[in-house]
Amino acid sequence: MNPPKSAPDAQGLSYRDAGVDIDAGDALIDKIKPFAKKTLRDGVLGGIGGFGALFEVPKKYKEPVLVSGTDGVGTKLKLAFHLNKHDTVGQDLVAMSVNDILVQGAEPLFFLDYFACGKLDVDTAATVVKGIAHGCELSGCALIGGETAEMPGMYPDGEYDLAGFAVGAVEKSKIIDGSTIAEGDVVLGLASSGIHSNGFSLVRKIIERANPDLSADFHGRSLADTLMAPTRIYVKPLLALMQKLPVKGMAHITGGGLVENIPRVLREGLTAELDQNAWPLPPLFKWLQEHGGVADAEMHRVFNCGIGMAVIVSAADADAAIADLTAAGEQVWKIGTVRASREGEAQTVVA
């Protein structure tokens, strides 16, 4: 084959000249293989590197239904870039998807990630993937594959974006869809670990206005670490609870807060009435509200306000559920009850 014609002084171009470093990509794969290996579980067929990842549905399921979820970390990443702190956003990525599929009763089976950047920094990417693997370990699911996309010119130097994909399974007869929720049922609130991964556009605006010292102590750790605390993963304690008593409904408190997520599991004609005095508003949310001048209603629409997962059970099972979850290391409060809706009323009200 004849070489292409070019200007007399032109040098031959390589992919590296175009901004893509194949060697860096290979180095990243070598770094992250041990992290992924720690997440392996029954059902994984083959290792990392195939064109597709293979997973055998566990034989314990008689009529398995697959449940899938996908999400990102949002503009929390902008704060991660500013702080040069990349060790927690991987857990955030996993949590956002596995907590979502958990709500329908699913056991997370496997997870895939997508990491996109303009120029690949191997150490940064490896730190992120290590966090993803840690999140998978906390969830009991396998990090079965992923994609690293180095795309020159698409992202500013030092920045990247993340997407995650979780697949789980639930017995068809045990799908949790909220259909059995009735008047008199109790809404339990499980404590969040902080802001989780929603509302960070407002958080960043408040930081811009208040201009705090992010390295300063804030109730025992730096404000930066408090803001970046990884999203709590509720998978193992709630899967265990489902084996012991009927869980009627669950809501992962993400974008939209309590007032927009709990209605997603309620039948028409039912309202969850929450008592805002039933649980303490954590100091970080008080700080955000004070420095941002954020109204109560807006706080409840944007932030989790200290509740990362809502669980609905019968009144007869509430105390047993609280005891079981507390023994598993969760902080739990009775935060409300389910009643008939009044005309023109929202399906979740905070009083």
UniProtKB/Swiss-Prot annotation:
Protein name per the record: Phosphoribosylformylglycinamidine cyclo-ligase
Principal location class: cytoplasm
UniProt cross-references to Pfam families, sorted A to Z: AIRS, AIRS_C
PANTHER family: TRIFUNCTIONAL PURINE BIOSYNTHETIC PROTEIN ADENOSINE-3 (PTHR10520:SF12), TRIFUNCTIONAL PURINE BIOSYNTHETIC PROTEIN ADENOSINE-3-RELATED (PTHR10520)
Gene Ontology BP terms: 'de novo' IMP biosynthetic process; adenine biosynthetic process
Catalytic activity, reaction form: 2-formamido-N(1)-(5-O-phospho-beta-D-ribosyl)acetamidine + ATP = 5-amino-1-(5-phospho-beta-D-ribosyl)imidazole + ADP + phosphate + H(+)
Enzyme Commission code: 6.3.3.1
Lineage: Bacteria, Pseudomonadati, Pseudomonadota, Betaproteobacteria, Burkholderiales
Similarity comment: family membership: Belongs to the AIR synthase family.
